[in-house]
From Swiss-Prot:
Transmembrane portions of the chain: none
Transit peptide range per the UniProt entry: 1-10
Organism: Candida dubliniensis (strain CD36 / ATCC MYA-646 / CBS 7987 / NCPF 3949 / NRRL Y-17841)
Localization terms from the record: Mitochondrion matrix
Lineage, highest ranks first: Eukaryota, Fungi, Dikarya, Ascomycota, Saccharomycotina
Name used for this protein in its record: Mitochondrial zinc maintenance protein 1, mitochondrial
Length: 117
């Protein structure tokens, strides 16, 4: 039970970090969390409970690392509100994948085959 409570608190904390400047979305996210806890309150076996707790921890981690709120500025551009826990990638994996894939504008890459091949 304590791991469940800890996961729930972590998820609430994650919603506060991810949606700190957007009260309607924060409230909706917290309602979803509460509903999910209620829906899973009837789980009986330890593996089911552990799976639900792990899923809740994964959701909290995803919210903290991947959700960034943005505000539209007067000039039409968006200001993104990054925080210290936001995961910032370097796009290296995207660049590596393009070498293998080739162009999708008609030229066939190494890993792309047509139906005629």
């Amino acid at each position: 039970m304590s791991s469940t409570l800890s996961a729930y608190r972590n998820a609430l904390r994650a919603t506060r970090i991810a949606f700190r400047q957007d009260l309607p979305i924060l409230q909706a996210a917290r309602m979803q969390l509460k509903q999910g806890i209620r829906d899973n309150s009837n789980l009986q076996t330890q593996p089911e409970i552990e799976e639900a707790v792990q899923k809740l921890n994964d959701v909290a981690k995803f919210l903290i690392q991947n959700i960034v709120q943005g505000e539209k500025q007067q000039d039409g551009k968006y200001f993104l509100n990054f925080h210290e826990k936001t995961e910032l990638g370097d796009n290296e994996t995207i660049k590596q994948g393009r070498k293998e894939m080739g162009s999708l504008a008609g030229k066939k890459g190494n890993s792309i085959k047509s139906c005629k091949d």
